[in-house]
């Protein structure tokens, strides 16, 4: 009888997984599962043979023009643990608006949409003159973006 397969999807920046995930393959093996690691956009990977696919260190999805390709790939998976609809919702930080509308506390957030085409001065005037703040693209991952 063959072992169940779990493929940990990552990106080319972390072909052997992120440091926090490096213990996963051994933990899966110890539980009788065949672990695999694959870069999500590697054309040489046969995803139809990947078993359950768990998206882990797929951080490069946020790079320009990668997001649509990433979602296309996520939708093509036969057995994803992270379903494409959730990945799409969670991949764009506007999901925080949905959470706030349902009463979940979020950090104070000012949304600056790219279509507003604001100058640096206009962006600066949207924030209080005191305190720290973070400017981050809506589609970003980790501390990147």
PLM regions and their residue ranges:
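Short, structured active-site "lid" loops
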Residues: 47-74, 78-79
């Amino acid at each position: 009888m063959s072992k169940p397969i779990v493929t940990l999807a990552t990106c080319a920046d972390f072909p052997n997984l992120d440091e926090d995930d490096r213990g996963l393959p051994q933990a899966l093996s110890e539980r009788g599962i065949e672990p695999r690691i694959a870069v999500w956009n590697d054309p040489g990977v046969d995803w139809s043979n990947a078993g359950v696919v768990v998206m882990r260190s797929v951080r490069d999805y946020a790079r320009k023009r990668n997001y649509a390709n990433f979602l296309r790939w996520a939708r093509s998976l036969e057995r994803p643990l992270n379903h494409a609809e959730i990945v799409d919702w969670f991949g764009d930080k506007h999901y925080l608006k949905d959470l706030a509308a349902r009463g979940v506390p979020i950090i104070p957030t000012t949304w600056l949409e790219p279509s507003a085409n604001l100058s640096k001065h206009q962006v600066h005037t949207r924030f209080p003159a005191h305190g720290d703040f973070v400017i981050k693209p809506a589609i970003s991952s980790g501390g990147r973006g």
